[in-house]
Amino acid sequence: GIAFAWKAGQWIDSDINNFKSLLWIFVAVSSLNAIAFWFMPKVETVKGSTNPFSAFKWLKKDKKFRVLIISWMLMGLGNLTALKIWTEYFANDQYGNGFSAFEVTLLTFIIPAGVKIIFTYPWGWLFDRMNFYVLRVILNVIFGAAILVVFYADSFWIIAIGTGLQGLAFAGGGIAWMLWVTKIAPPEHTAEYMSIHTFTTGLRGVVAPALGFYLLVTIGNSIAIFSAILITLASVVLIPEIIRSRKTNQL
Protein backbone atom coordinates (compact mmCIF):
# COMPACT_ATOMS: atom_id res chain seq x y z
CA GLY A 1 0.00 0.00 0.00
CA ILE A 2 2.79 2.44 0.88
CA ALA A 3 4.74 1.60 -2.29
CA PHE A 4 1.59 2.00 -4.40
CA ALA A 5 0.78 5.36 -2.79
CA TRP A 6 4.35 6.51 -3.46
CA LYS A 7 4.09 5.72 -7.18
CA ALA A 8 0.50 6.98 -7.43
CA GLY A 9 1.52 10.38 -6.05
CA GLN A 10 4.31 10.64 -8.60
CA TRP A 11 1.98 9.47 -11.37
CA ILE A 12 -0.59 12.18 -10.63
CA ASP A 13 2.19 14.78 -10.47
CA SER A 14 3.21 13.80 -14.00
CA ASP A 15 -0.36 14.23 -15.31
CA ILE A 16 -3.38 15.21 -13.22
CA ASN A 17 -5.68 13.25 -15.56
CA ASN A 18 -4.11 10.02 -14.34
CA PHE A 19 -6.49 10.16 -11.38
CA LYS A 20 -9.14 8.58 -13.63
CA SER A 21 -7.04 5.45 -14.10
CA LEU A 22 -6.33 5.37 -10.37
CA LEU A 23 -10.06 5.32 -9.64
CA TRP A 24 -10.45 2.21 -11.80
CA ILE A 25 -7.57 0.58 -9.94
CA PHE A 26 -9.31 1.37 -6.65
CA VAL A 27 -12.54 -0.19 -7.97
CA ALA A 28 -10.72 -3.37 -9.02
CA VAL A 29 -8.87 -3.74 -5.72
CA SER A 30 -12.03 -3.07 -3.71
CA SER A 31 -13.86 -5.73 -5.71
CA LEU A 32 -11.11 -8.26 -4.99
CA ASN A 33 -11.33 -7.33 -1.32
CA ALA A 34 -15.09 -7.94 -1.34
CA ILE A 35 -14.59 -11.34 -2.99
CA ALA A 36 -11.98 -12.30 -0.38
CA PHE A 37 -14.38 -11.39 2.43
CA TRP A 38 -17.15 -13.38 0.78
CA PHE A 39 -15.07 -16.57 0.91
CA MET A 40 -13.87 -16.12 4.49
CA PRO A 41 -15.05 -18.94 6.79
CA LYS A 42 -18.10 -18.09 8.86
CA VAL A 43 -17.36 -17.50 12.54
CA GLU A 44 -19.96 -18.80 14.96
CA THR A 45 -20.77 -16.27 17.68
CA VAL A 46 -23.02 -16.21 20.72
CA LYS A 47 -26.44 -15.12 19.51
CA GLY A 48 -28.11 -12.10 21.07
CA SER A 49 -31.18 -10.08 20.18
CA THR A 50 -32.04 -9.77 16.48
CA ASN A 51 -33.85 -6.46 16.96
CA PRO A 52 -31.53 -3.82 15.43
CA PHE A 53 -32.79 -1.11 17.79
CA SER A 54 -32.60 -3.11 20.99
CA ALA A 55 -28.88 -2.37 21.32
CA PHE A 56 -29.62 1.24 22.27
CA LYS A 57 -30.83 0.06 25.66
CA TRP A 58 -27.23 -0.52 26.70
CA LEU A 59 -26.54 3.21 26.53
CA LYS A 60 -29.07 3.59 29.34
CA LYS A 61 -28.23 0.47 31.32
CA ASP A 62 -24.42 0.47 31.18
CA LYS A 63 -22.79 3.63 32.53
CA LYS A 64 -19.27 2.60 31.53
CA PHE A 65 -20.42 2.02 27.98
CA ARG A 66 -22.32 5.32 27.90
CA VAL A 67 -19.32 7.32 29.15
CA LEU A 68 -16.99 5.69 26.64
CA ILE A 69 -19.38 6.33 23.75
CA ILE A 70 -19.65 10.01 24.75
CA SER A 71 -15.88 10.27 25.02
CA TRP A 72 -15.36 8.52 21.71
CA MET A 73 -17.92 10.77 20.03
CA LEU A 74 -16.14 13.92 21.22
CA MET A 75 -12.71 12.61 20.34
CA GLY A 76 -13.76 11.22 16.97
CA LEU A 77 -15.57 14.39 15.95
CA GLY A 78 -12.60 16.53 16.94
CA ASN A 79 -10.12 14.28 15.18
CA LEU A 80 -12.08 13.67 11.99
CA THR A 81 -13.06 17.33 11.61
CA ALA A 82 -9.38 18.13 11.18
CA LEU A 83 -8.26 14.93 9.47
CA LYS A 84 -10.82 14.93 6.66
CA ILE A 85 -9.64 18.29 5.34
CA TRP A 86 -5.92 17.57 5.35
CA THR A 87 -5.71 16.93 1.61
CA GLU A 88 -7.38 20.28 0.87
CA TYR A 89 -5.29 22.06 3.49
CA PHE A 90 -2.04 20.64 2.14
CA ALA A 91 -2.76 21.04 -1.57
CA ASN A 92 -4.55 24.40 -1.74
CA ASP A 93 -2.37 27.50 -2.14
CA GLN A 94 -5.05 29.47 -0.32
CA TYR A 95 -3.84 28.03 2.98
CA GLY A 96 -0.17 28.70 2.34
CA ASN A 97 0.93 25.17 1.49
CA GLY A 98 0.31 24.24 -2.14
CA PHE A 99 2.18 20.94 -1.88
CA SER A 100 2.49 18.67 -4.91
CA ALA A 101 0.40 15.52 -5.26
CA PHE A 102 3.39 13.41 -4.21
CA GLU A 103 4.03 15.56 -1.14
CA VAL A 104 0.36 15.36 -0.18
CA THR A 105 0.52 11.58 -0.56
CA LEU A 106 3.56 11.49 1.71
CA LEU A 107 1.77 13.50 4.37
CA THR A 108 -1.65 11.88 4.22
CA PHE A 109 -0.73 8.24 3.68
CA ILE A 110 2.89 7.15 3.33
CA ILE A 111 4.27 8.68 6.54
CA PRO A 112 1.29 7.94 8.84
CA ALA A 113 0.83 4.43 7.39
CA GLY A 114 4.51 3.63 7.82
CA VAL A 115 4.47 4.77 11.44
CA LYS A 116 1.24 2.85 12.05
CA ILE A 117 2.77 -0.39 10.79
CA ILE A 118 5.79 0.00 13.07
CA PHE A 119 3.84 0.78 16.23
CA THR A 120 0.74 -1.40 15.93
CA TYR A 121 2.30 -4.34 17.79
CA PRO A 122 3.62 -2.23 20.72
CA TRP A 123 0.19 -0.66 21.14
CA GLY A 124 -1.40 -4.12 21.09
CA TRP A 125 0.97 -5.16 23.87
CA LEU A 126 -0.04 -2.11 25.90
CA PHE A 127 -3.75 -2.70 25.23
CA ASP A 128 -3.53 -6.08 26.96
CA ARG A 129 -1.65 -4.71 29.97
CA MET A 130 -2.68 -1.11 30.58
CA ASN A 131 -5.81 0.40 32.10
CA PHE A 132 -7.96 1.05 29.05
CA TYR A 133 -9.13 4.50 30.16
CA VAL A 134 -5.53 5.63 30.67
CA LEU A 135 -4.58 4.20 27.28
CA ARG A 136 -7.46 6.09 25.68
CA VAL A 137 -6.36 9.38 27.25
CA ILE A 138 -2.77 8.86 26.06
CA LEU A 139 -4.03 8.26 22.54
CA ASN A 140 -6.18 11.39 22.77
CA VAL A 141 -3.16 13.47 23.77
CA ILE A 142 -1.18 12.19 20.78
CA PHE A 143 -4.09 12.83 18.39
CA GLY A 144 -4.47 16.38 19.73
CA ALA A 145 -0.74 17.07 19.50
CA ALA A 146 -0.66 15.80 15.92
CA ILE A 147 -3.46 18.14 14.86
CA LEU A 148 -1.86 21.18 16.51
CA VAL A 149 1.52 20.44 14.92
CA VAL A 150 0.02 19.96 11.45
CA PHE A 151 -2.00 23.17 11.44
CA TYR A 152 0.56 25.43 13.10
CA ALA A 153 3.79 24.11 11.55
CA ASP A 154 5.58 26.36 9.08
CA SER A 155 7.55 23.77 7.10
CA PHE A 156 6.90 20.54 5.24
CA TRP A 157 9.00 18.39 7.56
CA ILE A 158 7.45 19.75 10.75
CA ILE A 159 4.05 18.96 9.25
CA ALA A 160 5.43 15.50 8.45
CA ILE A 161 6.22 15.04 12.15
CA GLY A 162 2.59 15.90 12.88
CA THR A 163 1.26 13.34 10.40
CA GLY A 164 3.71 10.83 11.85
CA LEU A 165 2.19 11.46 15.28
CA GLN A 166 -1.21 10.87 13.71
CA GLY A 167 0.03 7.51 12.44
CA LEU A 168 1.36 6.70 15.91
CA ALA A 169 -2.02 7.49 17.44
CA PHE A 170 -3.91 5.55 14.78
CA ALA A 171 -1.74 2.48 15.45
CA GLY A 172 -3.14 2.34 18.96
CA GLY A 173 -6.48 3.89 18.09
CA GLY A 174 -7.27 1.19 15.55
CA ILE A 175 -6.69 -1.55 18.10
CA ALA A 176 -8.69 0.30 20.73
CA TRP A 177 -11.53 0.96 18.28
CA MET A 178 -11.88 -2.70 17.32
CA LEU A 179 -11.34 -4.36 20.69
CA TRP A 180 -12.40 -2.05 23.50
CA VAL A 181 -15.94 -3.44 23.56
CA THR A 182 -14.52 -6.82 24.60
CA LYS A 183 -13.33 -5.17 27.82
CA ILE A 184 -16.81 -4.26 29.04
CA ALA A 185 -19.50 -6.13 27.09
CA PRO A 186 -20.97 -9.48 28.19
CA PRO A 187 -20.04 -12.06 25.49
CA GLU A 188 -23.65 -12.54 24.38
CA HIS A 189 -24.09 -8.78 23.89
CA THR A 190 -20.77 -7.91 22.24
CA ALA A 191 -22.40 -7.51 18.82
CA GLU A 192 -25.01 -5.12 20.24
CA TYR A 193 -22.37 -2.98 21.94
CA MET A 194 -20.31 -2.95 18.77
CA SER A 195 -23.31 -1.97 16.66
CA ILE A 196 -23.80 1.18 18.75
CA HIS A 197 -20.10 1.93 18.58
CA THR A 198 -20.10 1.50 14.80
CA PHE A 199 -23.27 3.56 14.41
CA THR A 200 -21.84 6.53 16.32
CA THR A 201 -18.60 6.21 14.35
CA GLY A 202 -20.55 6.49 11.11
CA LEU A 203 -22.57 9.39 12.45
CA ARG A 204 -19.52 11.50 13.24
CA GLY A 205 -17.92 10.33 10.00
CA VAL A 206 -20.80 11.94 8.09
CA VAL A 207 -20.84 15.17 10.11
CA ALA A 208 -17.10 15.77 10.48
CA PRO A 209 -16.07 16.44 6.84
CA ALA A 210 -18.82 19.03 6.27
CA LEU A 211 -18.06 20.67 9.61
CA GLY A 212 -14.34 20.58 8.87
CA PHE A 213 -14.63 22.35 5.53
CA TYR A 214 -16.96 24.95 7.02
CA LEU A 215 -14.52 25.70 9.84
CA LEU A 216 -11.52 25.73 7.50
CA VAL A 217 -13.16 28.40 5.36
CA THR A 218 -14.36 30.48 8.32
CA ILE A 219 -11.55 30.21 10.89
CA GLY A 220 -8.63 28.72 8.95
CA ASN A 221 -6.02 26.82 10.92
CA SER A 222 -7.78 27.71 14.17
CA ILE A 223 -9.76 24.57 13.42
CA ALA A 224 -6.93 22.87 15.31
CA ILE A 225 -8.04 24.65 18.50
CA PHE A 226 -11.61 23.49 17.97
CA SER A 227 -10.44 19.90 17.55
CA ALA A 228 -8.09 20.11 20.52
CA ILE A 229 -10.92 21.35 22.76
CA LEU A 230 -13.16 18.43 21.80
CA ILE A 231 -10.34 15.94 22.30
CA THR A 232 -9.56 17.47 25.69
CA LEU A 233 -13.21 17.15 26.72
CA ALA A 234 -13.15 13.54 25.56
CA SER A 235 -10.29 12.92 27.98
CA VAL A 236 -11.83 14.86 30.86
CA VAL A 237 -15.04 12.78 30.87
CA LEU A 238 -12.90 9.68 31.38
CA ILE A 239 -11.18 10.94 34.53
CA PRO A 240 -13.92 9.71 36.94
CA GLU A 241 -13.81 6.31 35.24
CA ILE A 242 -10.02 6.18 35.59
CA ILE A 243 -10.35 6.84 39.33
CA ARG A 244 -13.16 4.30 39.72
CA SER A 245 -11.42 1.58 37.70
CA ARG A 246 -8.22 1.95 39.70
CA LYS A 247 -10.14 1.57 42.95
CA THR A 248 -11.87 -1.58 41.71
CA ASN A 249 -8.88 -2.82 39.68
CA GLN A 250 -10.99 -3.16 36.52
CA LEU A 251 -10.11 -2.55 32.87
Region annotations inferred by a language model:
Residues G1-W6, T198-A208:
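Glycine-rich segments within core transmembrane alpha-helices of 12-TM secondary carriers
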Residues G172-A185:
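Intracellular juxtamembrane helix-capping segments at the cytosolic ends
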